[in-house]
């Protein structure tokens, strides 16, 4: 009840001139696990509370809908892309929950479970992953609130998680950590090299620990699906070796149609490029 009152007073509508559909922004969403931040909930223009909707949880929420507020004046165009796919009948109707990042973005999107397996001296001195706490925020606080306020299918079959770069990293981790919550994950330009902005030390041992974690924990069954991709420009070019290792590992699982990987020559590490191919993972997760 207290949470509902706080969020009701903090809710505002998104800039309608930039948004296709409906966008509600809940400023300073409180948490016991991480610092508060904005949570942005997008619903289709014909949202009907008497119907049930799939839900996609996305990271870096401030970069999803409105280029006028982003650091580089680029956006994913989530509202336009998904509106078009719904209207064409290509996907099931869905809601998108965009969760803003914080100043601890790298730490919050870092898979906590691999830290003990990374050799001493590889991670920067004093580094602490907040990945587990961030996912508890998503799973234990944001999701129950969304399922209570909006008309959603709450089961894993209809719940997905998506992000790019480090957001792709934490999406793949969430997919493994909470297979009972997320039936699918989409990881664009996944930061599989685990290159750390605070050190020049080679992070290959950390990348190998991450891949081993995926190998041991991927929910490789018929009820779960995983999408990954990369370009080859800018930092995306540095993912070639680690992403190839992931593809090889997943191929050995004989996962058939549950895994989709796409390579986009000439594309870089930017919202404009992720927007240009967003329809592919969304169709894979939500296609009829």
Label each region the model flagged.
Residues 13-288:
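Non-catalytic cap/lid and distal C-terminal segments of serine-dependent acyl enzymes
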């Amino acid at each position: 009840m207290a949470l509902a009152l706080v969020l009701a007073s903090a809710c505002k509508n998104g800039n309608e001139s930039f948004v296709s559909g409906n966008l509600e922004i809940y400023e300073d969403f409180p948490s016991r696990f991480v610092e508060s931040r904005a949570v942005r909930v997008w619903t289709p223009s014909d949202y009907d509370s008497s119907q049930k909707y799939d839900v996609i949880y996305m990271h870096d929420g401030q970069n999803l809908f409105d280029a006028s507020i982003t650091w580089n004046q680029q956006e994913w165009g989530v509202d336009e892309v998904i509106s078009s796919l719904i209207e064409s009948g290509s996907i099931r109707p869905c809601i998108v929950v965009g969760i803003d990042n914080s100043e601890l973005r790298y730490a919050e999107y870092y898979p906590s479970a691999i830290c003990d397996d990374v050799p001493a001296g590889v991670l920067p001195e004093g580094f602490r992953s907040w990945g587990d706490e961030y996912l508890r925020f998503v799973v234990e606080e944001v999701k129950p609130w969304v399922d209570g306020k909006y008309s959603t299918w709450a089961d894993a079959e209809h719940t997905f998680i998506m992000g790019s770069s480090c957001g792709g990293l934490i999406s793949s981790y969430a997919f493994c950590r909470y297979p009972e919550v997320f039936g699918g994950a989409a990881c664009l330009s996944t930061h599989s090299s685990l290159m750390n902005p605070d050190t020049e030390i080679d992070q290959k041992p950390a990348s190998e620990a991450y891949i081993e974690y995926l190998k041991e924990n991927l929910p490789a069954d018929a009820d779960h699906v995983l999408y990954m991709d990369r370009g080859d420009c800018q930092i995306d070019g540095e993912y070639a070796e680690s992403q190839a290792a992931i593809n090889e590992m997943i191929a050995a699982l004989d996962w058939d149609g549950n895994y989709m990987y796409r390579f986009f020559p000439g594309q870089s590490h930017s919202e404009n490029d992720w927007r240009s191919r967003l329809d592919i993972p969304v169709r894979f997760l939500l296609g009829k």
